[in-house]
Regions:
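Acidic-and-aromatic substrate-binding clefts and catalytic sites of carbohydrate-active enzymes
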Residues: 15-18, 36-46, 70-75, 103-106, ...
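Beta/alpha (TIM)-barrel catalytic core signal, keyed to glycine-rich beta->alpha loops juxtaposed to Asp/Glu
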Residues: 101-264
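N-terminal binding-site loop/beta-alpha segment at the start of enzyme catalytic domains
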Residues: 1-61, 252, 262-263
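CE4/NodB-like, metal-dependent polysaccharide N-deacetylase domain
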Residues: 77-97, 116-120, 142
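Short, acidic/polar
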Residues: 15-28, 73-88, 109, 136-137
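A short, structured active-site edge motif that brings together acidic residues
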Residues: 59-71, 94-101, 130, 154
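A structural motif
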Residues: 32, 90-93, 123, 215
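Alpha-helix N-cap/helix-start motif at helix boundaries, enriched for small hydrophobics
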Residues: 9, 35-37, 93, 126, ...
Length: 264
């Protein structure tokens, strides 16, 4: 299985140019090794600026972006990826995702184009995002050696047991976006109790719970140095069995990201 760093910096809705650049620079200098962006975020250039300002060696961080749904025809996959690399100021990304199985997505044709980008050296691995278990099965039939991750919303209020099981079955990583449930984790009683017990934040509890699981990586968005640091410190938090059981048994569900074109 491709080794994806357990904690990454998400950059969705990080649209203030200076703030975005600074957050990427701060994260890398703090020790983050995984940066996640996307074409639709319209901040690849600012992310690239942050990478450059941090003066980190390219092999020291794992960089991911995503092709938007209107660019998933074979020719657009290639041209838009080239554009992404130019904006990011790099010669390759470690992981390029199909952002949603929607729009111009055609399993056979789209994945063929992605595989060609691996052969040309522009991307190292293929990712899918927001794929259902059935869609993941289909994609894995077409590109079993190249798909390494399915990025989906996952947090204590959306635990994704079935999808995680499917990712483990295929020996790929589930990359959890919105791992703090858009701030809702601060309002979950079970997380409040565990945070108080360990004298940490609810964000750290949620992230530690995710990262404790096999095949799971988390990419919380953060812009301030304080939040970037708080999230990073979750790597040092060890939850006990009682904590994990308490979170696992939360039955309330809340999906935060649900566009009209979602496949579920």
């Amino acid at each position: 299985m491709t080794d994806i760093p357990k904690l990454g910096l998400g950059t969705w809705q990080n649209t203030d140019p200076e703030e975005c650049t600074n957050s990427v620079k701060t994260a890398l200098e703090m020790g983050y090794e995984h940066i996640d962006t996307a074409q639709i975020y319209e901040n690849e250039e600012e992310v690239g600026e942050g990478l450059s300002k941090a003066e980190a060696d390219r092999e020291d961080y794992f960089l991911a972006s995503k092709v938007w749904i209107d660019q998933l025809s074979p020719e657009n996959v290639k041209s838009s990826t080239k554009e992404s690399l130019e904006k990011l100021g790099v010669d390759h990304v470690d992981l390029m995702y199909i952002h949603w199985p929607s729009g111009d997505y055609s399993p056979q044709e789209t994945l063929k184009a992605f595989k060609e980008l691996i052969h040309s050296g522009e991307i190292k691995n293929i990712g899918v995002s927001n794929f259902t278990p059935e869609q993941l099965d289909r994609a894995m039939e077409i590109a079993p050696k190249h798909i390494v991750a399915n990025q989906v919303e996952m947090h204590p209020l959306l635990q994704q047991e079935e999808l995680l099981e499917k990712c483990r079955e295929h020996d790929i990583t589930l990359v959890a976006y919105s791992p703090l449930a858009r701030g809702e984790v601060f309002n979950v009683e079970e997380l409040n109790e565990i945070a108080e017990k360990h004298d940490v934040s609810e964000a750290q509890v949620s992230l530690a719970w995710l990262m404790e699981k096999d095949n799971v990586v988390a990419i919380p968005k953060a812009t301030s140095e304080e939040h970037i640091k708080d999230n990073f410190e979750s790597l040092d938090l060890e939850l006990d069995e009682e904590d994990i059981q308490k979170i696992d048994s939360i039955e309330r569900e809340g999906r935060m990201v649900n566009p009209d074109f979602a496949p579920w």
